[in-house]
Amino acid sequence: MQLKTSIGLITCRMNTQSNQIETILVQKRYSLAFSEFIHCHYSINSNHSHLIKMFNNMTINERLLIKTLDFDRMWYHIWIETPVYELYHKKYQKFKKNWLIPDNGKKLISLINQAKGSGTLLWEIPKGKPKENESDLACAIREFEEETGIAREDYQILPEFKKSMSYFEGKTEYKHIYFLAVLCKSLEEPNMNLSLQYETRIAEISKISWQNMEAVRFISKRQSLNLEPIIGPAFNFIKNYLRYKH
């Protein structure tokens, strides 16, 4: 069993017009299933149920992209212009060995054609993988700024709150650890700009948005990742914090 850990920061504000607590969510440009397939995080055996499930969780456009058998296009759908040549070569050789050499992709296309429905692009809390010797909190702060453009001085960390969630996909366990922050008063206005101007953010995500609890529940019902068990307690913590603060 492989463990993959990501660290995130739930950053909240009180919307001064609606008088509701909101948090920032980001939407990835690609599904987790698509990323796992392109990076060859799967096994080839007689039972292809895990692969079919993986294809089920991809968007229709992602499945169509794989059916082209053009690994360059698949790779750069995730990485865009990022120069990761060594990793690319390693994954391409595995893709070629698994699917192109045996039958020129016929088996792969057949498996994709068995997929039913389609996945959605996830809305999630800004998060990412820690660098070597990087603390959990430092990772959460760095990833949050990379994905939203909001600097450390623009919010206050609430150290009493720390939550985690785990789920399994095939032979991989995904563990997410979350810290909590509240936005500075000067940035609470509803029209606060969230931009995608930095290349690091463009490469990973397609949308950034403030969402209240009703929206979080709606989003969670439409995707495989349920955000409510994490964001719900965070909002309750913020309510108590604001109550005692005032």
Swiss-Prot record:
Alphabetical list of InterPro entries matching this protein: NUDIX_hydrolase-like_dom_sf, NUDIX_hydrolase_CS, NUDIX_hydrolase_dom, Nudix_hydrolase_domain
Residues covered by the Nudix hydrolase domain: 91-239
Subcellular localization: Host rough endoplasmic reticulum
Major enzyme class: hydrolase
Binding positions for Mg(2+) per the UniProt entry: 134, 143, 147
Known cofactor(s): Mg(2+); Mn(2+)
UniProt family annotation: Belongs to the Nudix hydrolase family. DIPP subfamily.
Assembly and binders: Interacts with host RPL23A.
Description of what induces expression: Expressed early and up to late in the infection cycle.
PROSITE patterns: NUDIX, NUDIX_BOX
Motif position, Nudix box: 128-149
E.C. number: 3.1.3.-, 3.6.1.52
Known catalytic reactions: diphospho-myo-inositol polyphosphate + H2O = myo-inositol polyphosphate + phosphate
Organism: African swine fever virus (isolate Tick/Malawi/Lil 20-1/1983)
Entry GO terms, CC: host cell rough endoplasmic reticulum
Keywords: Early protein, Eukaryotic host gene expression shutoff by virus, Host endoplasmic reticulum, Host gene expression shutoff by virus, Host-virus interaction, Hydrolase, Magnesium, Manganese, Metal-binding, Multifunctional enzyme, RNA-binding
Active-site positions on this chain: 143
Protein name per the record: mRNA-decapping protein g5R
UniProt function note: Decapping enzyme required for the removal of the 5'-end m7GpppN cap tethered to viral and host mRNAs to allow their decay in cells. May therefore accelerate viral and cellular mRNA turnover to eliminate competing host mRNAs and allow stage-specific synthesis of viral proteins. Acceleration of the turnover of cellular transcripts may even promote the shutoff of host protein synthesis. In addition to the mRNA cap, g5R also efficiently hydrolyzes diphosphoinositol polyphosphates.
Key word Lyase present: no
One biological process term in Gene Ontology: symbiont-mediated suppression of host gene expression
UniProt keyword Coiled coil present: no
Domain of life, source organism: Viruses
GO molecular function, one term: RNA binding
